[in-house]
């Protein structure tokens, strides 16, 4: 059975990355973390990926793009680029949650107990973050929401399980969420290479988004809530 060739685009934070995959195999990836110069970087990275396909006489089957939450500007650039490719090549588009991409990266970096929970965080403003909670199978235990962090945030989870906090929103929470079960990991940013398994599954399941109407989860659209205790 032919394995799908998918281009993955991740632009939800200051890190811009692209990956090219065939099935679950990464054929190419490029990363730049120098700042929000995503538009020009994407054009270069994508041209490099397409040249690899041309040299191997292969064609793209789909484009996967991070869906947020994240930077309004970054997401807009990534999604508009993905839409342009899908329209031009007449191929489907796949969306992947930014928080799931980050969780996949953390799970790939170390061995965790099956009971460990994972809380990726995207920085918003002041003590606000955009977060979700997943188990070790990246199954959603708590949906994405905007949270104002205080000392009892996520208490119902952290008092029962070890919970790993990470992402650019986790740094400001370290001195507020203090518990023996709370673990903080630094320097975790969503990367396109960690989208591959999600893109592959979505393609096989034909779980595509409408290219014309798809919009990512911009931070400004979230409703602020206080996490349940």
Residue ranges and their predicted role:
Residues 1-67:
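N-terminal beta-alpha supersecondary unit
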Residues 2, 25, 37, 92-190, ...:
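Surface "functional belts" at beta-alpha junctions
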Residues 33-44, 72, 76, 80, ...:
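Residues at secondary-structure transition points
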Residues 41-44, 80, 84, 101, ...:
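Short amphipathic alpha-helical face segments that pack within enzyme cores
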Residues 49-53, 88, 106, 192-203:
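Stable alpha-helical structural segments in soluble proteins, enriched in small hydrophobic residues
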Residues 64-98:
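DPxDG-like acidic metal-binding loop motif
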Residues 185-217:
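Glycine-rich phosphate-binding/hydrolytic loop that grips phosphoryl groups
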